Amino acid sequence: EAIKKSKRLKSKIISIGITNQRETTILWDKNTGKPVYNAIVWQDRRTSKICENLKKRKLENLFRHKTGLFIDPYFSATKVKWILDNVSISKKLLKNKQLMFGTIDTFLIWRLTNKKHHFTDATNASRTMMYNINSNKWDDEILKKLNISKSILPKVKNSADDFGTTSKKIIGEAIPINAVLGDQQAAAVGQACFDKGSVKSTYGTGAFAIINTGNKKILSKNKLLTTICYRLKNKNTYALEGSIFIAGAGVQWLRDKIKLIDNAQETEKISKSIIDND
């Protein structure tokens, strides 16, 4: 659609970059390319009980120090586990080595390259709660705790890397895919947050603040997430992130469910009419 709207020749497109919802999870059949279940989006809280069980097993410190994340339904790991536990076809495909996992970037790469490449980048991997941000590998100990097979996981690459070439069968032209970043990290790069201490805040469905911490991984004492901002030439640049799940989604709720407003723009006038909201 973007190519058609731009009215540009496909042959003049030098390369493609992908940015995506980070934690949203898909498992699919390697042979057919069809998902075994609907994508479970980042806001979905259905895996709360799985997370509580992990906490009861006193695994919070393990996950925190290895992945930089807290045990929470937000991240991909327990979504993967839920599908494996509740969708019968996934077990059969896993047994036959036909099951694949990916966040949205991985699924897009798989489809755009016509099933040739099963890749992700470090920023997306760092949001799965299965990736060790110290060793830069899928973590065997964590996978064992979750009973998730490494065989379904994609290869993790630099954020700027060779992710394959689009298939002519898919979009009519062979175009290199040379960059992949999770959406919030892509926003940080877009705002030129390349220096240690530089910060961006994005307001959309949720609100997300990211601060570049350079080559140093910092574990926050204030419930911030430790994540990978980007990886270039096999070197991580780390970040701290504050995530608020409901921002613009709250405005949507006021408009569509409560019917308090007719359009989102009205919220600005209402906010400005209040002298003090303490």
Give residue spans per PLM region:
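Gly/charged, well-structured mid-domain segments that form the phosphate/adenylate-handling core
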Residues: 155-162
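Active-site core segments that coordinate phosphate-bearing ligands/cofactors
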Residues: 48, 55-69, 73-118, 129-140, ...
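Short, conserved phosphate-binding/catalytic loop or strand-edge motifs used
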Residues: 23, 77-78, 125-126, 160
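A structural motif corresponding to the C-terminal end of an alpha-helix
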Residues: 145-152
